[in-house]
Structure formats: C-alpha cells, structure tokens
Amino acid sequence: MRRPLVAGNWKMHGTRASVAELIEGLRRQELPVEVDVAVFPSSLHVTQVVEGLAGKAVKVGAQDCAAQVEQGALTGELAVSQLVDGGCELVLVGHSERRLILGESDEVVVSKFAAVQKAGLTPVLCVGETREQREANATLGVVGGQLAAVIDALGVQALNNAVVAYEPVWAIGTGLTATPEQAQEVHAAIRAQVAQLDAQVASELRILYGGSVKAASAAELFGMQDIDGGLVGGASLNADEFGAICRAAGN
C-alpha cells in the first residue's frame, strides 16, 4: 500500500513575516497521520520553516539544487550537502518552470536527481506536457521520455527512493486542472512504463498530481487508483486550504 504524499511548492513567494504566518497556520492544522506532508519554501526561508515546524509531522524540501553534492565555486547555486545541512529531506528536480523558462535539459535533470540521491535525500521528479503537446496527442510520449531519461541513465532501481510528480504544464497556475480521468491515464502510463522494467518498483512508486490542485477537487483526484497525492502550488500558500487537501488524501 502506497502512503499518500501531499507536497506544497511555495515557489518564489514569501517574506519572513508571511512565512511566519504560514508556519503558524500549518501548526494549527490537524494533519492525517496516514499521509506524508511536505513543503518546499524558497531557499531563503528553508531554515525558518525547518525551525518553525519542528515537532510537526511536516517534511521540508528544496525547490532546486546544484547538480553536485559537494560545496564549491559555483556562484548562486546550492550544493545538495548544504541542503542536507539546512534540514531538507526532499528536493524538486525538473519542475516545468525550470525546464521551460530556464532551459534545463533532461541531462541536467538527471544530474540533479543523481546528486540528490547520492546525498541521501529524496528527489521529486517532475514530468509533464505543454498545451501544444497535449493537443498534438504527444502527452504520453513527452512524459515517458522525461521519465526514461532518468531510468536510462541511472537504472529503474533509482526510483526506489524517489517520487514522481505529473504536472500538466497547461494546468499550472491557470486555474485549469486535468480531469481525474485525464490525470489517471497519465499516472497509469507512468506506472506501466516502470512496471515493464520492474513490477515491484512500479507498485511502490508514489506518483503525485500537480496542476492547480484545490481542496474542492482533491478528493476526486486522490480517489484515482494511480494518484498517490499532490504537488500543490498556489493553494499551499493558504494553510487552511492546504490542510484540507492533506485531509482529502487521508480519506
């Protein structure tokens, strides 16, 4: 039985004051014990969040990292070892905003994925298609290719200590969301792709849905067989909304 995971990606949001308010709101939430919960603040606020949520069953992750574990001369980047030191347990890799806006290639994503695992943290591999790719019926090919880049380079066993998040790019921050059936189709295809190589890895792999997840839509999405939780964007900046999404995963 796969344990649900709900992860909040705060993206490039927050001041020390607003993050303190969000921490306080999260501390008030009754979170289901059967659901793993994580938040991904900006790197500037990681320490504040780790300290503020101490004793609360919420893991803290980083939104990105350098493609190396060790510290070194790489201005503006964060080595994975620094994230370990800061209290992070997970790291997002390959988020669509980094792929599309910042030009991160599959090769860069693979390098970051490997560095995160080498340091003992859990990578959350983001995959997804654009509106144009969906309209061209290329969704499964695009998503499958992004997943295959990691498997081909590191082996299917690399997914044993990893999470995959399917995020249809056309649904991120747009208010649009894939229907539960659309999301399930892609999640099932991801699991089937992994199962062709290792059935046990596939059965244990947690696959999250990320694309304008809201409390109102969460229960129906999470009710799908191959959807194991959510990577939540804007809604995670509201503690009550995020708490409701977490509770939906527990139901």
UniProtKB/Swiss-Prot annotation:
Pathway, per record: Carbohydrate biosynthesis; gluconeogenesis; Carbohydrate degradation; glycolysis; D-glyceraldehyde 3-phosphate from glycerone phosphate: step 1/1
Family: Belongs to the triosephosphate isomerase family.
Cited InterPro entries: Aldolase_TIM (IPR013785), TIM_sf (IPR035990), TrioseP_Isoase_bac/euk (IPR022896), Triosephosphate_isomerase (IPR000652), Triosephosphate_isomerase_AS (IPR020861)
Job of this protein: Involved in the gluconeogenesis. Catalyzes stereospecifically the conversion of dihydroxyacetone phosphate (DHAP) to D-glyceraldehyde-3-phosphate (G3P).
Organism: Ectopseudomonas mendocina (strain ymp) (Pseudomonas mendocina)
UniProtKB keywords: Cytoplasm, Gluconeogenesis, Glycolysis, Isomerase
Catalytic reaction annotation: D-glyceraldehyde 3-phosphate = dihydroxyacetone phosphate
GO annotations of cellular component type: cytosol
Residues the record lists as binding substrate: N9, W10, K11, G173, S212, G233, G234
Name by which UniProt lists this protein: Triosephosphate isomerase
